[in-house]
Amino acid sequence: MVRPTRNRKPINYSQFEDSGNDSDDDFISSSTPVNKSKTVPKVLKQDKPKPNLKNLQKEEVLPTEPPKKRVALDDKVFQRGLEVALALSVKELPTLTNQVKKSKEKSTDKQGKEKTENTGKPPRVSNCSVASDDVEDLDKITEEGDASSVEGERKSPSQAKAPRRRAPSEGSDGSSANDTESESATGEGSESDPDFDESKESDEDFGVRRSKESKKKTVQKKPAGEKKERKSKPKCEASVTSVDPAPAAIKSGSPSLPQAVGLPSEATRKPAIMCSPSAESKRPKWVPPAASGSRNSSSNALAGTPAKSPSQSLRLGLSRLAPVKRLHPSATSSQVR
């Protein structure tokens, strides 16, 4: 369906010119040109300054100043104390430098005075003045002393070898051996030089050790006939004969006293070693516990029969059928013999 056309009425704005104010642009009279209305806003727009983009960026970049924070009273006092200390230290520095300079000047002055005093004093003269001839004599004396000490050192090994050679040639009797060793000790003391005192102790210790070893070897190599003779002698006689030569060695006063004193102790050991087999033969054989105690009366009758070891009756916490090892397997074999 087609709409009917509207009826439009023309409106005259001239009627409203006198009644209203001309301030509003909406109610402009129709007689005014259209161009003026368009030009007026352009002029207004040109009057307004265009803001530069650079200025805007700078304003944005500049940081806004933060508001000042209020500082506490303790912090203020601390900062003021620091400022005062810095000011005082700056004032004290020049005074310290002046004091250091003065101390250095004083030390240099003292050193200069000491040098002048030392140069003014005459050189000290020693009490012992030696002439050129005396110096030559002193050199000769020192050379002779060195030569004598070298000779003493050469003699010391030969003197230490002498007791080694005499030790194997000792006889079977301990008394004769001790007598010869005491004589050799006295002879060595008379032949030794005063320079031998320095290396005396080491050579004597070495000689004593060698003599002990040689004596042990000779005791082991002696025949059975001598052993029987030693068994017949009692221990008291052997100790008496071995102790006798000790006072002779002490009276001699020779430098080889440790050798003479150490020999009697070795001689006392010899008869004890030789008599040990006889002591072993006298020891009673092991008797089983069954033969001792209340059965002493029947021990003589059962002496010929071999006794059983006590381990057979012991159970030791095991069952009766479990085999038990004997505690003393060698006991029965020794009794049978």
Curated annotation (Swiss-Prot):
User: Which modifications occur after translation, per UniProt?
Assistant: Sumoylation with SUMO2/3 by NSMCE2/MMS21 promotes stabilization, possibly by preventing ubiquitination.
Residue numbers covered by motif WVPP motif = 286-289
Where is the cross-link described as Glycyl lysine isopeptide (Lys-Gly) (interchain with G-Cter in ubiquitin? 251
Q: Where is this region: Interaction with RAD51?
A: 295-334
Signal: present as a keyword of the record?
A: no
Looking at the UniProt record for this protein, which Gene Ontology cellular component terms does it annotate, in alphabetical order? Answer: chromosome; chromosome, telomeric region; nucleus
Where are the compositionally biased (Polar residues) regions?
28-38
According to the UniProt entry, the cross-link of type Glycyl lysine isopeptide (Lys-Gly) (interchain with G-Cter in SUMO is at 251
Where do the record's region annotations for Interaction with DNA lie?
32-50, 225-286
Q: Where is this region: Disordered?
A: 1-69, 88-337
The name of this protein is RAD51-associated protein 1
Organism the protein comes from: Mus musculus
